[in-house]
Amino acid sequence: MTSLAAGKPAPLGASYDGKGVNFALFSAHAERVELCVFDEQGNEQRFDLPARSGDIWHGWLAAAGPGLRYGYRVHGPWDPAQGHRFNPAKLLIDPSAHRVEGDLPDDERLHGGMWQPDRRDSAAVAPKSQVVDLRYDWRGDKPPRTPWGETVIYEAHVKGLTLLNPQLPEAIRGTYKALGHPAMIAYFKSLGISALELLPVAQFASEPRLQRMGLSNYWGYNPLAWFALDPRYASDPDRALDEFRDAVKALHAAGIEVILDIVLNHSAEIDLEGPTVSLRGIDNRSYYWVREDSDYHNWTGCGNTLNLSHPGVVEWARQCLRFWVDECHVDGFRFDLASVMGRTPEFRQDAPLFEAIRRDSVLSQVKLIAEPWDIGPGGYQVGNFPPLFAEWNDHFRDSARRFWLQQNVSLGDFAQRFAASSDLFARDGKPPSATVNLVTAHDGFTLRDCVCFNQKHNEANGEENRDGTNNNYSNNHGIEGLEANFAVIERRRASAHALLTTLLLAQGTPMLLAGDEQGHSQHGNNNAYCQDNALTWLDWRQANPGLTAFTAALIHLRRRIPALTRNRWWQEGDGNVRWLNRNAQPLTAAEWQQGAACMQIQLSDRWLLTLNATAEVVDMVLPEGEWRAVPPFAGEDNPVIMAVWHGPAHGVCVFQRS
């Protein structure tokens, strides 16, 4: 290995062809790029990348292969005023690497310098990129391609979901392998979900601040290598990629889609005081949004913001998404703080990355879900994403919680959210599935905590309970905490059932947080991003089987109601929906404006939801016909025909007309 051939500019990253490895790196402002390879003893050998095509630096190294450890040193101007922070003393991770060896330590040698370059060499402590052979036997794999109208999403953390499941072999608990194990697949199938949405599995790092407190980043929203499977979730770190692909293949065989939470908005380099380990040293001005004072626009709250309007960065991001679809066969993405993807810097529906996805024949066909906000100016964009995207709907979450737990939202607002928030999404040709309905998610209270806590309890996060939202719209039903008397426990159970029924029988795409169906609590912590412990791990031995069965019955019931699966907007008089009062009469204009009270929702003519959000028992006259309560509100062979429902406080029931 004495010199490199010219190689080719695509694809980005390190590509093994059986005879050698092609290296390609985007940097618009670099003046020279050195490829640094390391032997088993850590000895470094450097090669200049000999060719440049546009802004792609590239070269081909003969006789190199899988397992080769490498990094880059990138030469260019040190000119913070112009956004340039090149520093060849810093060994840099390939942003398209398919494996990264080593964690990101809290070590000053990784710092690139604030206003003057830090000349200390970082190679001894910097994580190393590694060449990977991407070949895999996908024979027999068939993506489920579940229609949006039939999709039920289950949001889960690989480790938190599986670590304490006694049905799994101990050696694979907490790993990718566990996801594809027959015991987990049987659980998913019995529950009825159609898509498993995983919190980030691309390699991430723990912030230095957390490391100093003895904590770690648990959720994974601090990306270090966007194209690399995080080895911490592998039973064998050397096989992380294949273990993940094995799980995807097994899930597909069971008809379950896999959606990845992807963090295309910031990097683990944090702010100017953070480490220089990749993008900052490769081309700071291109990869990040840089302010006139040379600091970063912090529209993510994480110290920096990716500039996904730059053509080179757009292509890098597109190739990242294609890697996950082409090489890992994932079925879609949930984009964290997705407004960043549309910034130019103002948000636009035709932003470069959105257009690149729309034009891509593969990416335009997978499921795309946006978290439609960031913390920058104009960052809240619910309902404004391009038609290809579904969006998390916080209006639904807040309205459902306020209806059942606060009793301070009108029937009209609740009905609007129940009917797929047509005021937000019935435009640009979007279907009702464009709203991803949720009552809880990984951030915020769990379902159980929504009915047990009025206040957040985040002291364990080390920020004196300042972190996490204060707008929880929760209700502890008179006693703060999990312990309560029988009467309070019953009220909590009724409220949890009502919220689950609202979520799973509303129009739109429902998303269930893993553990909500088991009664999992985080003891009031509504921002458990740094709690890799029993607070966040699902305790399967303590799961509530009655609540699990209730949830599963609702999901299976959902699939029987055409108004919920056809994915068409409800229109006046089309037979899909009727909104009725407690006397089975159409709601009046005055009743629509009432705060939380009683209503009946008739779906597809034969199905009826009765809702009593008051604190009193209410008799509700059912519409004309013979109505029987159905599971999970009655047994399979329920013979009781009702004309009046004696609705308990905070109660809900579903009926079918004979």
From Swiss-Prot:
Keywords: Carbohydrate metabolism, Glycogen metabolism, Glycosidase, Hydrolase. It catalyses: Hydrolysis of (1->6)-alpha-D-glucosidic linkages to branches with degrees of polymerization of three or four glucose residues in limit dextrin. It comes from the Bacteria. One of its GO terms (biological process) is glycogen catabolic process. Signal peptide: none annotated. The keyword Lyase does not apply. Its EC number is 3.2.1.196. It is an enzyme of class 3 (hydrolase). The active site is at D336, E371. NCBIfam families: glgX_debranch (TIGR02100), PRK03705.1 (NF002983). Belongs to the glycosyl hydrolase 13 family. Removes maltotriose and maltotetraose chains that are attached by 1,6-alpha-linkage to the limit dextrin main chain, generating a debranched limit dextrin. This is Glycogen debranching enzyme. It comes from Klebsiella pneumoniae subsp. pneumoniae (strain ATCC 700721 / MGH 78578). The gene is glgX.
